[in-house]
Amino acid sequence: MSGISLNLKRKPKVKKKEEERKRKNVFNEDEVDPQKRSKILITEVNAHEAAKAKRRVIVPACSGRASIVPPKFASEQGPSYGLTESTGEQTGRPDKSAAKSGAGVVPLDQLPDPTGLEEYSEVPVEEFGAALLRGMGWDGDEEEIEGDRRGQKTVLPHEQAGRAEYLGIGASSDVDRSRKDARLQIEEFMPVVKVDRAKDTAADSST
C-alpha cells in the first residue's frame, strides 16, 4: 500500500541574490550609462491638434469684361464683430430715418373714402362671382345659357368622346364620333415629305 506523508514544518525561505541587470553594449562601447528608473508625473494632458492642410484655390484670371454680379450693399455684408466704424460710403439704399421723419406720408384729406356697409350690401357675397364675370366682359344672360342646356344631358368625364387625331387645341371637329363610320369620315393624314434641295437647284439650273 502507498501512503501520503504531510510535513507541517515551515521550510526556511532561501533569499536569492538579485543580480543587477546590465544594459547590453550593442556598439561595444566602454562606458554605458546604466538605465535609470524614474517616475513621470502627468499633471495635464493637452489635446493633440493635427495641422490642417491648406486648401488650394484656383483664382481665375481677370478678364476685360465687367462683372454682371451686383455689388453688395453695406446692409447685405456679413456681420463684423467688435467696433463698427462708419466709412462714410453711400449704400444706395433709402435711409430708414426718412420714413420716421414723415417723408412720403399722404395727407388725410387725400386718402380714399373707407368702404362702408352700404357698399357691401349693394354686392352681396352670393353675387360676387357674377360681378367678377361682368367685369371680365360677361353680359349676364344666364337665362339663354340655361335654356340651351335644358335639353342636354350631363356628360360624365369618362363618357366624353375622344378628340380627333391631329386636332389642335380649341378646334372643333366636323366628324360625328357617335356614328359607327366615324373612322371613314376622317381623311387620311398626309405626312410631310423631305425634299432634297440640292436636286431641286440642279434641276432649276439645267432648265
UniProtKB/Swiss-Prot annotation:
List the subcellular locations: Nucleus
Q: Name one GO biological process term.
A: mRNA splicing, via spliceosome
Please list where the region (Disordered) is annotated.
1-37, 68-121
Q: Which InterPro entries match?
A: Spp2-like, Spp2/MOS2_G-patch
Keywords of the record, alphabetical order, are: mRNA processing, mRNA splicing, Nucleus, Spliceosome
Q: Which domain of life is it from?
A: Eukaryota
User: Cellular component terms, GO, for this chain's entry?
Assistant: spliceosomal complex
Annotated Pfam families: G-patch_2
Q: How does it assemble?
A: Associated with the spliceosome.
> What family is reported?
Belongs to the SPP2 family.
Q: What does this protein do?
A: Involved in spliceosome maturation and the first step of pre-mRNA splicing.
Identification of the protein by name: Pre-mRNA-splicing factor SPP2
The protein's gene is named SPP2
